[in-house]
């Protein structure tokens, strides 16, 4: 699927710097006082190799003039600069060009630096109109990457990932053992052959698999909290742990490298190893945060003692009595390093973003893929949406309804769900891999069997 740019978000005017400036003049001219310099937007998004014209205004005290500055003539000799020209460069007339995936700051200033302004620029890979059109299309059997896979327990998958060679990974709830999460690995269209069990980690809404030679590392929310119904959620930390399949051993609470962000919980990770990006989402009532870090910076952060929120866990068997405690552990404290960017959305947010249940996210090439939806039962019919944003939260591809799950009869005929399931198909997991978008769905087969399905766009 070839990606093309659809639009660039422009936000309201913002003041980025103020000062007083007396313009250069001939001997017989009055000096002219400049009060402030303003960019058109505090955030600009553009695609690789795209060139756009940046616009600014100069404001004079007491003046009502409200026109764009003539960047071509440049009568005040404004100076333009980029914090990282390898990501985005800007010429003497304010023309901006994207060169590499990432984010940097563009500065515009008077020649003596007495007045200046900045705007943050994000360069992405150009995903746009073609993706929205693909997602809107009706069901076609060619969309199915893997269908009707029964996992280890008769519960729905929560998320999935895909290796470079096409191997599928799943994260599944423990069913009658609500303290467990299963991490499973298998070929498309086949039940997984091996798995490992995680105990008291959380709900597993999102996870990621990191490939390192022959080894695989799982990024997942950890140090979960037991809710009143016995289920687990509200992960306090994110862990990166080596995949070690063992059907007789459980890993408790966390493992491997564990990462902490002060005052953030309900945390889930996504990674883009090619571009050295770690993104962590955290949620509280009414809001969801997305925070971006250099993956290498996160791994290099030294271990320190951190105190978690009070958590309850255990009590599922006689050997593990229930505990409620405030624990101090050693972790990589990401609060100590500067993020690359972040944004927060309300629930529901702009353009109805996050109107439905959050079903996962992924990051790739400077973009964040946001997945939401609900199954038939909560809604008259199953529904799912994908929205693509940049690392500043600007919408790059508008919220698009997934058309492939609208025709229940077609899904039944294709063996995705059964005729006695009332059209149950629930969005579960999203990944952008190898220039293709993969979205997951949990369905019910005959006899209420739970199936995992993955579509590819």
Task: List PLM regions with ranges.
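C-terminal motif of bacterial Sec signal peptides marking the signal peptidase cleavage site
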Residues: 21-24
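Extracytoplasmic soluble-region selector
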Residues: 26-128, 207
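Surface-exposed loop and turn segments in beta-propeller and other repeat-based domains
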Residues: 136-150, 194-200, 245-265, 304-354, ...
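Beta-strand-rich domains and repeat architectures in extracellular enzymes and scaffolds
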Residues: 146-179
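Structural signature of eukaryotic scaffold interfaces centered on beta-propeller domains
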Residues: 153-165, 203-216, 263-279, 354-364, ...
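Beta-propeller blade signature
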Residues: 180-189, 232-246, 288-301, 305-311, ...
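Blade-loop segments of beta-propeller domains
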Residues: 184-225, 418-421
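Loop/turn-rich, solvent-exposed surfaces of beta-rich toroidal or solenoidal domains
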Residues: 349-403
């Amino acid at each position: 699927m070839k990606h093309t740019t659809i639009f660039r978000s422009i936000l309201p005017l913002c003041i980025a710097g103020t000062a007083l400036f007396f313009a250069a003049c001939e001997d017989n001219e009055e000096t002219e006082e400049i009060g402030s310099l303003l960019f058109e937007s505090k955030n600009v998004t553009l695609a690789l190799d795209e060139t756009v014209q940046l616009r600014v205004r100069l404001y004079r005290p007491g003046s009502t003039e409200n026109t764009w500055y003539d960047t071509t003539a440049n009568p005040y000799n404004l100076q333009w600069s980029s914090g990282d020209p390898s990501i985005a460069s800007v010429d003497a007339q304010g023309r901006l060009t994207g060169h590499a995936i990432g984010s940097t700051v563009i500065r515009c200033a008077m020649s003596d630096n007495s007045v200046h302004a900045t705007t943050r620029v994000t360069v992405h890979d150009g995903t746009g109109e073609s993706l929205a059109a693909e997602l809107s299309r009706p069901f076609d059997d060619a969309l199915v990457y893997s269908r009707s896979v029964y996992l280890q327990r008769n519960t729905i998958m929560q998320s999935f990932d895909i290796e470079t060679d096409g191997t599928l990974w799943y994260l599944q709830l423990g069913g009658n053992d609500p303290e467990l999460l299963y991490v499973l690995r298998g070929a498309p269209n086949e039940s997984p052959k091996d798995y490992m069990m995680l105990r008291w980690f959380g709900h597993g809404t999102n996870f990621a698999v990191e490939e390192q030679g022959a080894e695989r590392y799982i990024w997942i929310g950890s140090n979960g909290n037991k809710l009143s119904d016995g289920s687990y959620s509200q992960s306090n930390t994110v862990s990166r742990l080596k995949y070690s399949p063992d059907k007789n051993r459980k890993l408790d609470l966390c493992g491997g490298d564990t990462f902490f962000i002060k005052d953030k919980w309900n945390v889930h990770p996504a990674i883009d190893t090619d571009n050295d990006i770690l993104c962590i989402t955290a949620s509280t009532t009414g809001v969801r945060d997305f925070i971006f870090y250099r993956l290498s910076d996160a791994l290099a952060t030294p271990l320190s003692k951190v105190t978690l929120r009070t958590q309850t866990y255990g009590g599922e068997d006689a050997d593990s009595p229930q505990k409620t405690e405030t624990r101090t552990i050693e972790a990589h404290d990401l609060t100590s390093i500067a993020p690359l960017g972040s944004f927060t959305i309300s629930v529901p947010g702009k353009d109805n973003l996050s109107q439905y249940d959050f079903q996962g996210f992924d990051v790739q090439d400077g973009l964040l893929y946001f997945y939401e939806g609900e199954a038939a039962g909560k809604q008259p019919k199953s529904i799912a949406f994908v929205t693509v944003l940049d690392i500043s939260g600007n919408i790059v591809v508008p919220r698009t309804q997934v058309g492939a799950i609208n025709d229940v009869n077609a899904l039944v005929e294709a063996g995705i769900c059964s005729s006695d399931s009332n059209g149950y198909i629930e969005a579960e997991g999203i990944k952008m891999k190898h220039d293709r978008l993969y979205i997951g769905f949990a369905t019910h087969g005959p006899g209420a069997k739970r199936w995992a399905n993955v579509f590819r766009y």
